[in-house]
């Protein structure tokens, strides 16, 4: 048996992804019909993980070919390429392929959201952005508690590190796929880490050196596209950081300006009748202050305080000299 080429490995992966998509969809629809849309939104990632584990548990871990591998006629072998992988190696493959990405996303996504919040919005409102109120989970509360203790410099450094990690994993995956197109050995990064390759049991019609050359050219194009997209993402990240910094500066200046205006308004006594600066302050028997012109005109129609409605004759008004 010869080593499987890139066309067989890609066809097998696409076929497995097709059946995995159907299994995930069926499991999600079952949960949606039994528990409702809210629970489905809350647990859809876990449902996808359980579907992947069930699929690979019944095939790879059990020692059978997956439906995609059976479709193209390839089998898994260990680094010696003479024996099928041990059960432990196959279990490690499934853990690296299905469980590890879920755990990384579960850890990095809440941390990135808390760091991006940066105190700009009330903490209680952040949970509304998450489906099913997942912000109440213990992991998110732990992340929120420790993120609140960070200084501004530590928060910026950690936010930059989380961004680099998330983008780095995505770029590493794309780089690995491009390298596979060129060399045609490991399509999934998990298989490279587990040391599992493929041998083909039959030769597919139409495979020749021209197809391998085409995949090599595709790999070079993918590498070029990866470099360009990495540059654009880095530029976009710097632009967002600059815009966020300018917005915080503008917000602080606006808050400071509004505070100064409020203080100035508080220092200027206002008449509650004309809503302007109080002139010739006059006191009613109940102790409220108004402009002399405003309160005398008021008393011509109503002999009561405009605020507390206490009755009093106009001659009880007291003009306050040298009082603002």
Curated annotation (Swiss-Prot):
It comes from the Eukaryota. The chain crosses the membrane at residues 6-35, 37-58, 88-120, 146-183, 215-234. Zn(2+) 2 binds at residues 286, 288, 305, 308. Residues 119-139 are annotated as: Disordered. This is Peroxisome biogenesis factor 10. Its main location: membrane. Component of the PEX2-PEX10-PEX12 retrotranslocation channel, composed of PEX2, PEX10 and PEX12. Interacts with PEX19. Disulfide bonds: none annotated.
